[in-house]
């Protein structure tokens, strides 16, 4: 569990913990990546007590040693944890050599605040030697000390007709989605801070540190005001198709520059692109990805908005889905579906050969017309599609049609 000390000093368990522990028993190396301040360092230090050596590359002395004598960091028989390894990606080659000399489960636990598989200049992926996990900002159930994400696994493994019973039996209780969107999921502002003013100071410090320090680790960016302007513009496009030409026009930057900046934001786990489900049978489909943010609190701060919108509710559901997906052993995809004619399903979960379509509506009273695109999706994909899930902000849990269940978002997330 992730021990986070704050107003309440009891442990805050994280959904990823069982998956991390299990993979350390199987693989020689486990790599935990995610945005800065999601709790990676705290999480892995819990596993270092009395049994692992811990080195962080935030320490300049450790960086100097990594450059001068990497074998000194990775050698020996004691398991090693290397924190913020993206600062010296050449260390991955030393880790590979150490594993090849003596392959042992749990030998290395690495963390990084950038996606090592997307970083330019990283030539070593530890293929066949490492398992990769992503720690996303905390879900609302993690913030409530329940140690998990939403009930996605319950819905995936149950028959459609069992969904009502599953949701009624396990609910974390109602919550104001707007308040959740404002505080986001980074542990410090989400759990330890109680006022909007405190969070605003934290988010501004986070943005400045990212621009002035963390971003420079990935790429030399001199025009920081331009980069921040692009970040702000992206925050206004939550849930929209990624159109780099339009973004470039909005921020008055060349399209290749916008392309580069978006890739850097994605590499840093600040921006999330959701791919399209593009298996077309009878309908022509859009194939561009949709854009979301890794944390709604940060997105609201960067945009200057104070009132969350329906797009922020979608983003909250996506964050919960990502937490669930990235701790699973079985491969799953989070996608969206949109036809050229304008029919759209916000998210499609593809796993085990089946499709779970999800629509998110910021309404307290879902109506039959809100289920129209879910039903269209089911007609298009037949037996491959599960019943549709219509998430809303009210309290009603009911089948609005024989194949679409309307459920409060807080019953699932």
Report residues per predicted region:
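Conserved lysine of the Walker
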Residues: 40-41
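Accessory nucleic acid-recognition modules appended to NTPase machines
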Residues: 2-5, 190-355
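Conserved catalytic/switch belt of AAA+ P-loop NTPases
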Residues: 92-116, 123-125
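Hydrophobic anchor at the beta1->P-loop junction of P-loop NTPases
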Residues: 32
């Amino acid at each position: 569990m992730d021990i986070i000390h704050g107003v309440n000093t009891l442990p805050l368990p994280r959904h990823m913990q069982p998956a991390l522990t299990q993979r350390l028993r199987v693989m020689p190396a486990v790599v935990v990546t995610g945005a800065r301040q999601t709790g990676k360092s705290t999480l892995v230090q819990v596993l270092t007590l009395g049994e692992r050596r811990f080195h962080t590359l935030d320490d300049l002395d450790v960086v100097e040693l990594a450059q001068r004598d990497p074998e000194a960091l990775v050698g020996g028989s004691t398991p090693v944890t290397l924190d913020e390894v993206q600062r010296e990606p050449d260390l991955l080659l030393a880790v590979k050599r150490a594993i090849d000399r003596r392959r042992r489960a749990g030998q290395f636990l690495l963390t990084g605040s950038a996606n090592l598989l997307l970083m330019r200049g990283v030539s070593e992926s530890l293929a066949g030697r490492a398992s990769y996990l992503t720690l996303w900002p905390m879900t609302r159930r993690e913030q409530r000390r329940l140690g998990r994400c939403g009930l996605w696994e319950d819905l995936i493994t149950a028959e459609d007709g069992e969904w009502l019973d599953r949701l009624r039996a396990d609910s974390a209780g109602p919550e104001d989605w707007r308040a959740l969107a404002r505080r986001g999921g980074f542990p410090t502002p989400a759990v330890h801070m109680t006022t909007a003013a405190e969070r605003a100071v934290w988010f501004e410090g986070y943005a400045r540190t990212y621009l002035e320090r963390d971003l420079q680790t990935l790429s030399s960016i001199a025009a920081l005001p331009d980069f921040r302007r692009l970040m702000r513009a992206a925050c206004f496009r939550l849930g929209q198709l990624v159109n780099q030409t339009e973004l470039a026009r909005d921020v008055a930057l060349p399209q290749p520059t916008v392309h580069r900046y978006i890739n850097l934001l994605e590499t840093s786990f600040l921006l999330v692109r959701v791919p399209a489900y593009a298996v077309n049978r009878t309908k022509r489909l859009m194939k561009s990805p949709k854009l979301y943010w890794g944390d709604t609190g940060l997105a609201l701060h960067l945009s200057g908005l104070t009132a969350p919108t329906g797009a922020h509710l979608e983003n909250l559901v996506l964050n919960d889905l990502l937490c669930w997906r990235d701790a699973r052993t079985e491969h799953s995809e989070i996608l969206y579906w949109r036809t050229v004619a304008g029919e759209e399903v916000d998210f499609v979960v593809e796993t085990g050969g089946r499709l779970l379509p999800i629509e998110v509506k910021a309404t307290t009273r879902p109506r039959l017309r809100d289920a129209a695109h879910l039903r269209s999706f089911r007609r298009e994909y037949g037996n491959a599609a599960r019943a549709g899930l219509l998430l809303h902000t009210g309290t009603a849990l009911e089948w609005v049609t024989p194949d679409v269940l309307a459920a409060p978002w807080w019953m699932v997330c």
